[in-house]
Amino acid sequence: MTIPLEIQQRCQQLKTELQRASYAYYVLDDPFIPDSVYDQLYRELEDIEKRYPQLITPDSPTQRVGDKISSQFVSVRHNIPLYSLENAFNLEELNKWGNRWQRYVNETQDTEYVCELKIDGSALALTYENGFLVRGVTRGDGVTGEDITPNVRTIRSIPLRLNIDNPPAIVEVRGEAFLPLDTFDKINQEREEKRESLFANPRNAAAGTLRQLDPKIVDKRRLQFFAYTLHLDDNNITNQWQSLDRLESMGFLVNPHRQLCPSLQQVAQYYQDWQEKRHQLAYMTDGVVVKINDLQRQNRLGFTQKFPRWAIALKYPAEEVPTVVKDIIINVGRTGAVTPMAVMEPVQVAGTTVQRATLHNSDRVAELDIRVGDTVIIRKAGEIIPEVVRILPELRPNHTSPFQMPTNCPECQSPLVRPVGEAVTRCVNSSCPAILRGSVVHWASRDALDIRGLGEKVVILLIEQGLVTAISDLYSLEKTEIAKLDRMGEKSALNLITAMAQSKNQSWSRVLYGLGIRYVGSVNAKILAESFRTVEELANASVTDLASIYGIGEEIAQSVYDWFRIEANRDLVAKLQAAGLQFAAAAKTTTTKATLAGKTFVITGTLPTLKREEAKELIEKAGGKVTGSVSKKTDYLVLGEAAGSKLEKALELGITQLTEAQLLELIKA
């Protein structure tokens, strides 16, 4: 069907005007048309697109909110790792960082810095192809994140199409999605009216919103987005300040309170000013991000295993507020650690309602001499974990008694043990309900087996009914058994059975993390799973074998070794293997396309995610050749952290340098 020219022109006119109005409203905060006019124009565009679907384009304002996502979010690898930042908690630590970077590049002069407010939200990585938004991904572990593109498209301060002539093939943008405080309050008010659980703080609400399976819900919550990093091949951009200006010109909302500081002395003043003024903002911040402005100097400084050397997050001091202790209870964790907790009158700390705070251990309880009825000062350590800082003895009521740590586990009544040299008291009964409960919840957690629907309440019901006495029991549960549990039913039971079946496809590193071995976090689990391709290899490794792996120290090595010496743990592994869980690394896929045929590579330094042997294997499978030294025959030098003389030689010979991300793109080409 031929579309009349005047209809085509009107459609484009409406799109342009609505995009301009949206930018003025959500980015510039300076609307030029009333909402009623916007709605009228929007409906007109909708009507045209319904009659002529050929006119629908990905950047149309009508295409921001899509249909429900059919299944779980897909994990994708970041093209460029999304590093977290090193933290400094005072000006002394800021100055130490300044001295460190100067020593690293052998400089004695200070430099120019860009200061930006550290927004308390969720980091996102956006990819634009030929100017159009094609992907929005969560930070995840920095290497891989979840593809939440349908939800990202609903955020009005993220342009669907870049405001740029002749856009590059690829543009990467990083920034923070967040909820303004008034929006957060409104959401919690609505949830309270519906008798739904309240969000603890705006950061949690933003993260939870982004993982919604229905973009319409995300759209209603009106998330905002501040852009702060631009990855774009443009020789005209030489510093971070220019990057931020370019992001603004492309149509992004960039925090207006950024400042260019000629020295760390001015950085300190900026930090102190905003520490005082931060509560005047319409959103939460938890510090200041300091970046070296010069991009060439950033490149020279590079990255550590975790952080960029050219940036640091200067956190605000924790807020401290008084409250009254109503009770002191004992919490038993999944590792058996017994932690005293203060139950208090509810109080707001750093934007969150706090009713409990950790007392850490028996030594800390004795040091504080904390008692029920005491008025205490609490704060959030790193603005995350509430803790009791001190008591106010002058406000202590009469006839209080010192708190006594129990000698038996409050959950199973087994004698508690305090290992020599440790501050933590432990329950060592592997059948303790609290340890089992914590272990199963950990097994089902997002970074482990990610079993949707298996939260703490369901776990408690399964344990109380005697259906689960070990993690392995999860995989022999019947739908009818689950359906009989309180508030479950047939549909929920089927969903849970399906989620547990899907968990059998999770990787060996996730399974290893899910086992809950002391000191083995998700990152350590990945390192171990890469070094030991099967559980048998890991179980048979000596402490020396384990400790020799980069990133695995003596403490972790001893813990892993000891865990596999316990018969009950070996039995658990055997049962989980029999249930079909993955206890071996997946076979590495081969590349059939010889995309690197005839090319010679040299690898130098430590790569962000690949071991050198893994990078070599990928190159060779793609038809390339890897040599140990740079010569005129070298086509590419693959650069990692701490590149040495090979880089100097490559620069001298004019050899092309590649990052790990660029190498992977070359292989895929």
UniProtKB/Swiss-Prot annotation:
Sequence ranges assigned to domain BRCT in this UniProt record: 591-669
Catalytic activity: NAD(+) + (deoxyribonucleotide)n-3'-hydroxyl + 5'-phospho-(deoxyribonucleotide)m = (deoxyribonucleotide)n+m + AMP + beta-nicotinamide D-nucleotide
GO terms of molecular function: DNA binding; DNA ligase (NAD+) activity; metal ion binding
Entry keyword set: DNA damage, DNA repair, DNA replication, Ligase, Magnesium, Manganese, Metal-binding, NAD, Zinc
Family note: Belongs to the NAD-dependent DNA ligase family. LigA subfamily.
Described function: DNA ligase that catalyzes the formation of phosphodiester linkages between 5'-phosphoryl and 3'-hydroxyl groups in double-stranded DNA using NAD as a coenzyme and as the energy source for the reaction. It is essential for DNA replication and repair of damaged DNA.
Protein name: DNA ligase
Species of the source: Microcystis aeruginosa (strain NIES-843 / IAM M-2473)
